[in-house]
């Protein structure tokens, strides 16, 4: 029936209804009534419109399925966070494969992990997961979902979030978002209380996570899909029972041991100097100054100028410099830093080398705060001028130091830490000493003042020789500042001072490829028999998805009359990579060891560094101004040819990068090349 069937004019309604006749007092003659034959009323006229086939406003794009499809589940166990007391400010993802020093705590208080197919394959090589189906002879893949299971800890609570919106890049403010207090204020989060906090709760929580929001449900080549990020999991250890003050603490404030910037005016103690020069806190320091301290448990008076300038026969030109910064008696030795009195010819002289400050995190709103790296190679105290990544402004100290050390470690080289130290500017640090420093505070660990390494580790010979403040002797104080923040575990002087967030993941993929026909068949009667347990299953063979090239496989169209075509064999020979494990020994140097893949956030500067160099090289002009004589014409031609080859190489690099970005857009738009 048409759609207007229920709305049509119902002409039979009221057919048997007669109006009630009116009665008059006087009888009138009946009017002649002629009965007409009943006739069906005419149908309502409608304007007939011709049917026109119009185009659809939307179009459904379909993709042909591969001939062979198998469901693969990648199951494994992982630890998003693990660490110990003293590492709350660090990211455990960066410390995963680091070699921790003896007696040093490892790990971190939060973790940010990126999962991709390439990372899952790297974990399979480490025997950290299993693949239920092999991806051999399967060049296509589809990502379906991920099921994460989080297991509760005995004493430590956790806050977990996940993100499905790429890109996952890092800047100097990224890790602050993963502070436990910041995660608790998010709208969507997973709170995993410990067994002590919630004794009657379930021991685990399960969460099903969908694919990235802009990813299409279609088939992709494994080689292109392997390096793309699928999921970001971030978690932080927190304390729901003692959010702001620990169970064994008297108050929230912490004490900072800082270098007195009025005494240590020069910051060039890392620069070597030849005799007769050596490091001095300031240029006009009196050589006869005596430092009075209780070093070694008794009152001692130490004249450092006399000890440094006492030359020993046979010493080199750098002997005075190394004595001025040595642990035995330099300007940063315990004899100087523990001094409670300085005098010149029995007259008290100020300022003292160390100043104590008290930091109150409850009133710190970040206004006017600055955290920056100060060089120890030259100059005086001051803000960095050229590198904006070396400074953080307008952030509370307990939040600004959260993950900042690992950010510099990832984006810069680790060699910057022996040449710099952290300095803060904050009005929320107060002191009661009369010789107050300037507006900035160069803090150091108390163990450095006592002449010890952090966590009582062994002092090496180079450390005894170069005993001066660096970032390495500030980590305990940085952790104490971060511990003063809200909801950070405060486990100092406690027995249970470690944590670990154990997780189980199950990534669901579908592998697709050609249907393998014409498989070899042998006579079963000629098969050999050997003893083997029937219950043991043979392990699956897994191929690196990044090297699983579609052009190296035989498909149905590569067979003709039961034989492989010559075109298919030629295509495979051109695209088949050589396995480095099968190469013969040679006299050439071995290839450098490949760096382990870390599931960390991406640095956008490193991504574009090579491309920027190629673009700059295209704009370079030849600066050769030699006269064109017969002798140097050949040299000029060779230089021009080399420059053309370099330009050609840079253009190929740019085109390759453009194609990679186009393939990345295919994950979101589905546009084929």
Swiss-Prot record:
Chain residue ranges for the region called Disordered: 575-595
Subcellular compartments: Virion
Alphabetic keyword roster: Capsid protein, T=1 icosahedral capsid protein, Virion
Gene Ontology annotations for the cellular component aspect, listed alphabetically: T=1 icosahedral viral capsid
Function: Self-assembles to form an icosahedral capsid with a T=1 symmetry, about 30 nm in diameter, and consisting of 60 capsid proteins. The capsid encapsulates the genomic DNA. Capsid protein is involved in attachment and entry into the host cell.
Record family assignment: Belongs to the anelloviridae capsid protein family.
Name of the protein described by the UniProt record: Capsid protein
